[in-house]
């Protein structure tokens, strides 16, 4: 295979990788209900609500949780809103 063909193949693979949508495996914390169990502390956090297609605020109790909480609405939207 010539170097030009290899370069074209590399370019196409790079383009494919950039344009492929992110799967739900990469966003596990976006698809779960928020953990509202009370533990060591109560702080405001945000979770993604797929029905509302928005990040909503809730009281996070500080437990180990399920990974579905974000410190800010901006971070939540960045990771989950598609």
From Swiss-Prot:
One short Pfam name that applies is Kunitz_BPTI
In this chain the BPTI/Kunitz inhibitor domain maps to 30-80
| Residues of the site described as Reactive bond for trypsin | 40-41
- Report the transmembrane regions from the record: none
Q: Does the keyword Disulfide bond apply?
A: yes
| Keywords, comma-separated and alphabetical | Disulfide bond, Protease inhibitor, Secreted, Serine protease inhibitor, Signal
Q: What is the name of this protein?
A: Kunitz-type serine protease inhibitor PILP-1
Identify the species of origin.
Answer: Bungarus multicinctus
């Amino acid at each position: 295979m010539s170097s030009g063909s290899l370069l074209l193949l590399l370019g196409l693979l790079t383009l494919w990788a950039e344009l492929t949508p992110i799967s739900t495996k990469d966003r596990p914390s976006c698809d779960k209900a928020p953990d509202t169990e009370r533990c060591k502390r109560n702080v405001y956090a945000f979770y993604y609500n797929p029905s509302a297609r928005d990040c909503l605020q809730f009281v996070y109790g500080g437990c180990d949780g399920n990974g579905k909480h974000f410190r800010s609405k901006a971070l939540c939207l960045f990771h989950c809103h598609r």
